[in-house]
Amino acid sequence: MKTIATFEAPGDYQIESEVMNAHQKSSIGNALIRTYMERDYIVPEKFEDFVYVGLVLQGQGMRHGLEAHRRNRPYCMGTLYWQLNDSWPVVSWSSIDYYGNWKALHYQAKRAFAPIHINPIQRNDSLCVYLLSDRLDTLEKMTLEMKVIDFEGKKISKPMLLKSLSVPANTSQCVYRTKLDALLSSTKRPLSEELLHCFMLLTLKDKSGHVVDETVYFFAKTKDLLLPETTISYKMKQTDGECELTLLSPVLAKDVFIEVPLQGARFSDNFFDLLPGERKTILITSPQIKKGEELPLTVKHIRETYN
């Protein structure tokens, strides 16, 4: 929003306003954003929320594509995406805007291109967990832990642990496959209902116990998930040039977006899922951050955009 605010007045905030259309060089661009949003998300009424959900939509869509390409090695051996950045303040496919702000896509591309990446995929009534490697060496004695957790933080199935995994160089391999009803056999709700109340947390560790990759997987489209309402609490610690932000939510907060009114500010992470009871620390850096000066902060998550 801080980039849109550089070329459009708040009184004109509409997706099809004359100014917004002038800054959208695809004749079908804004309509296409809404079409895809209606498919996967609950479309917000507020303009600011529409912009935020549009960013989330772009990031998730591109991430799914990048992961599919990696998963289908050797038929696909690499991906370049359109586009990296912008030459002016505009609505576009870029992952970094004109002022150097990272969009959701840039964070999702960073995750999807991790050298070792966990990629679960549903096929009909089954779940297959892939390990994707772009490394040039084989990793041995890896451990993959998988937990199914509801949105309030309760584990709803026994954790699964795969030990002594080998991850060969430059490979895509399915290391775990199961039927969804077997995965959630201990739950009391019908399977179709339970899948809307939970997520899977997958963590890959090396032989020293260090986390190599972690993925949060949902079993349904975001618009179908029965996400809980929540308020994210946070604490800030500022010094010259940086702000340490610690976030906490009692229940799941999906697609958390942190924004400060500083063009080009860097975030150690953004557009992430904040897990129930998890304390997550984000480092914000900018030469404009000053110790002792209040830093205006916006923290938003998907559930807040529901009308």
Predicted features by range, described:
Residues 179-229, 287-307:
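Terminal connector regions
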Residues 227-275, 282-285, 302:
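C-terminal accessory/binding modules appended to enzymatic or scaffolding proteins
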Residues 78-83, 257, 296-300:
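Conserved active-site loop/cleft motifs that coordinate metal ions or position small ligands
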Residues 113-124, 219-240:
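Extracellular ectodomain segments of secreted/surface proteins
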Residues 1-140:
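Substrate-binding clefts and catalytic carboxylate motifs of secreted carbohydrate-active enzymes
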Residues 144-193, 263-290:
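Intrinsically disordered, low-complexity Pro/Gly/Ser/Thr-rich segments with frequent PxxP/GP/PP motifs
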